[in-house]
Regions:
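A short, structured active-site edge motif that brings together acidic residues
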Residues: 44-45, 144-153
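Short, glycine/charged-enriched secondary-structure capping and boundary segments
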Residues: 22-25, 138-142
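Short intrinsically disordered, low-complexity coil segments enriched in acidic
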Residues: 1-2, 153
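Substrate-recognition element of Asp-dependent hydrolases with the DxDx(T/V) motif
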Residues: 91-104, 110-139, 148-151
Length: 153
């Protein structure tokens, strides 16, 4: 039966990349560079991601039109900014922070495992992430996708 399989499609967030540790690390670096007091940046990452499903539900239910994940992440960042001392930053700084999702680090075995699978199969993503987000993440993390199926597909 596996001889009939031609392609393997993967979820990305949490499966291939470590979003929690990546977001926490980059948020900590961002905060330090903007003189923001130390906070629990792991909790920040979790709080930010916890708003993902409610935001997606608004899109699925028609409360919001199709909205790219970059935009949903930015809207959700605004919701938690005050709690983490970020609300007085310029919009451009928050836009910069929002791009951490484009630079998530892979799990230690992800690239090697995907590369091995790629030798036998077409490998790709299936994600709610917009294609630009997924391409940037792949380039940054060295993820060897053959195809990226993102939200616009």
């Amino acid at each position: 039966m596996m001889g009939d399989v031609k392609a393997l499609i993967f979820d990305v967030f949490g499966t291939v990349v470590d979003w929690r540790t990546s977001v926490a690390r980059m948020a900590r670096e961002f905060a330090k560079s903007h003189s923001i007091p130390e906070a629990d940046w792991v909790q920040f990452a979790c709080d930010w991601r916890d708003l993902y499903q409610p935001a997606m539900e608004k899109v699925r239910s028609g409360g919001l039109p199709f909205t790219k994940l970059d935009t949903l992440h930015r809207m959700n960042l605004d919701k938690i900014a005050k709690k983490y001392g970020l609300s007085n930053l310029p919009e451009e700084a928050l836009d910069e922070l929002n791009l951490v999702w484009h630079r998530l680090s892979p799990w230690p075995d992800s690239v090697e495992g995907l590369t091995m699978l790629k030798s036998r199969f077409i490998i790709g993503t299936h994600s709610n992430g917009n294609i630009a987000l997924m391409v940037n993440m792949a380039k940054n993390a060295g993820l060897p996708w053959d195809v990226i199926l993102g939200a616009e597909v």
